[in-house]
């Protein structure tokens, strides 16, 4: 049980530094790497929750209990500055992680026996009304349903002041993926398994009417996340922030993201276009126009 928490009907989880994910990976406590991740979390993920217009939620950061004391002090400082934020230090074992999820029930303020849990990565962000949107589903009719905002804004920094942004539609994305549960059969969203299978394993509510979505950063360390540069739009920093403000994503900063150099590659599509005779291109267009 996590003592002294402000309880709420909506609780989020961030798997920040427990060393049981993806097998052998980089040391999360290596000084430069720690600093890089910490700044992105503080200026992107955490700031997006500071901007929520509904503050009736709790965000739990799951850490390794082996985190160095000076690093712990920095997270505890963030906790003191943000009433919704709590650090949970656990052993580097799956059993300890599972116990933390089970014990999180003590930190839920059930509303008519119903609550919602959600997940987010430590380098992504949600729109300012994310919690408010989830609050509409704290009803018994939705118990057992997952909730997804399928639109994503993928951001990659390519120069000091320039960014690529790609809008993407992905129903089972992990940015704010949520699950409606109850007191009798409490289950968290992290117990549903891999997020990309959630829409196969549970009935899912897609908030498609929203003109907004979450931000996924491409920052050089999240190798699983990718961007299709051919579908991205170039923005300078000021333009990017203005665009995201229209999507109710405000006050976050991307100037900690690493810069991706332009790849010295030519796409397969461009290569093939060099070898296709013009007459075949014309015929292809005519065939397409018939369907």
Q: Which residues are covered by each model-predicted region?
A:
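Conserved catalytic core of nucleotide-sugar-dependent glycosyltransferases
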Residues: 95-110, 127-205
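Acidic metal-phosphate-binding loop of nucleotide-sugar-dependent transferases
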Residues: 123-125
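Active-site-proximal specificity loops/subdomain of glycosyltransferases
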Residues: 23-31, 36, 61-116
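Short, acidic, metal-binding catalytic loop of nucleotide-sugar glycosyltransferases
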Residues: 29-33, 44-56, 82
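Short amphipathic alpha-helices and their capping/turn segments at secondary-structure boundaries
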Residues: 1-11
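Short loop/turn segments at strand-loop or loop-helix junctions that form parts
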Residues: 11-27, 64, 150, 219
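C-terminal catalytic/acceptor-binding lobe
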Residues: 4, 177-291
